[in-house]
């Protein structure tokens, strides 16, 4: 679920996702189009693509099972669809952490008008 995704991002980055990522670049937050603007925006693009491949459950609403072991998230549970959502969220949270040093505030509250280029395929 989006609440679990928020939790993962906060634990991985120490940042509040609603302020730091919800309105960043062309792909972070609702929707997405154009060309990812930087590495952080690409994390969101890849996450959107990952959600797009999930069938049989709702990535934004369905609650999955995960645990933390030695600072890493481990996706669990018996439902393969929910496990897939968890993996999408986990990989995006890791991506955000890995790209913290290139986060650029100029892409925060980025205007959709700047995202007019043709979108690349997933």
UniProtKB/Swiss-Prot annotation:
Location of the active site: 47, 89
> EC?
3.1.1.4
Q: What's a GO cellular component annotated to this UniProt protein?
A: extracellular region
Instruction: Please give the Gene Ontology molecular function terms for this protein.
Output: calcium ion binding; calcium-dependent phospholipase A2 activity; phospholipid binding
Identify the cofactor(s): Ca(2+)
Superkingdom as given in the UniProt entry: Eukaryota
- Give UniProt keywords alphabetically: Calcium, Disulfide bond, Hydrolase, Lipid degradation, Lipid metabolism, Metal-binding, Secreted
Q: What is its main location?
A: secreted
| Catalytic reaction list | a 1,2-diacyl-sn-glycero-3-phosphocholine + H2O = a 1-acyl-sn-glycero-3-phosphocholine + a fatty acid + H(+)
Chain's role: Acidic phospholipase A2 (PLA2) that only causes a mild edema, when subcutaneously injected in the mice foot. PLA2 catalyzes the calcium-dependent hydrolysis of the 2-acyl groups in 3-sn-phosphoglycerides.
What protein name is recorded for this chain? Acidic phospholipase A2 BlatPLA2
